[in-house]
Amino acid sequence: MKNEMLALILAGGQGTRLGKLTQSIAKPAVQFGGRYRIIDFALSNCANSGINNVGVITQYQPLELNTHIGNGSSWGLDGIDSGVTVLQPYSATEGNRWFQGTSHAIYQNIDYIDRINPEYVLILSGDHIYKMNYDDMLQTHKDNLASLTVAVLDVPLKEASRFGIMNTDSNDRIVEFEEKPEHPKSTKASMGIYIFDWKRLRTVLIDGEKNGIDMSDFGKNVIPAYLESGERVYTYNFDGYWKDVGTIESLWEANMEYIGEDNKLHSRDRSWKIYSKNLIAPPNFMTEDANVKDSLVVDGCFVAGNVEHSILSTNVQVKPNAIIKDSFVMSGATIGEGAKINRAIIGEDAVIGDGVVIDGSKEVEVIGYKEVAGVPNED
């Protein structure tokens, strides 16, 4: 079996900075934009880029993520020559197989990669919101005769110290990599998206393990090793919308940016669709007293209150006189009569009691999965 490029999505992160939202699910399984989960963006990019085989590497709380991905049919990745394979840690005769880092997760799955036998491997994070044509990145990789290509995004200089920064020459060849530098020399921030020549990466990972050299992380170990050995390492410059939604604030911001006709993600672009697992729900119902403005309301919602600049996911109930503003409400949540919610993220199947006030005007408030805030009305 031969495929030119295999995609490997790193989806095992716990996402501790998302607090209550990831207590029972992996970060890539967190809901986004009303009808999606975060991993849908990486999977859809793969499908739209013509990548036939995708490995999803999981670790922390994988059940919801595994169920969501299923056999890959939602992304058209269930054909004779295509597929999604969920790769989890396992025990072997040589010992524990728990993943120790990003590149260690790849090393532990060499047998799977060898079965696909790709010429190139595309490494992706499963927790970013963006649209990218990976085929364009691969062409750049080939044109540069690169051994490794790193996707980068120009960021404001004041924010550059939060990222791994790539310093390049005039031909976009990387001459230096700095991990979260205090005084950055450039603004080219790594997006955590890499294309490697598989044979070379395979050798580097195996030799590192054999010789006791730490090669467990791409940013800390592998990229510096490539640069030190003189490998041809280049950037792929991306200028579209990209958001790391690893914090409560950034997840809320991304959802708010998703609303409206002028959303930066161009969600209505039919030439590059974002696919997800289809959920069957009845049509929305809004009472005559409902007031919905500048909001995204997904199927199955019952709205009898007021909703402004917010997202209501599948099967959300908003009872009379409730007010929701600048908030993201996940599927199955119930908002009680007269409740007031401002700048908040309400988790799946959460219940907000009658008259409860959740005010995130100073800091975005979060109600977790199945959490009950206040005493719900038994009716």
Swiss-Prot record:
It comes from the Bacteria. GO terms for molecular function: ATP binding; glucose-1-phosphate adenylyltransferase activity. Transmembrane segments: none annotated. The keyword Membrane does not apply. GO terms for biological process: glycogen biosynthetic process. Alpha-D-glucose 1-phosphate binds at G164, E179, K180, S190. It catalyses: alpha-D-glucose 1-phosphate + ATP + H(+) = ADP-alpha-D-glucose + diphosphate. Its EC number is 2.7.7.27. Pathway: Glycan biosynthesis; glycogen biosynthesis. It is an enzyme of class 2 (transferase). Involved in the biosynthesis of ADP-glucose, a building block required for the elongation reactions to produce glycogen. Catalyzes the reaction between ATP and alpha-D-glucose 1-phosphate (G1P) to produce pyrophosphate and ADP-Glc. Homotetramer. This is Glucose-1-phosphate adenylyltransferase. It comes from Streptococcus agalactiae serotype V (strain ATCC BAA-611 / 2603 V/R). The gene is glgC.
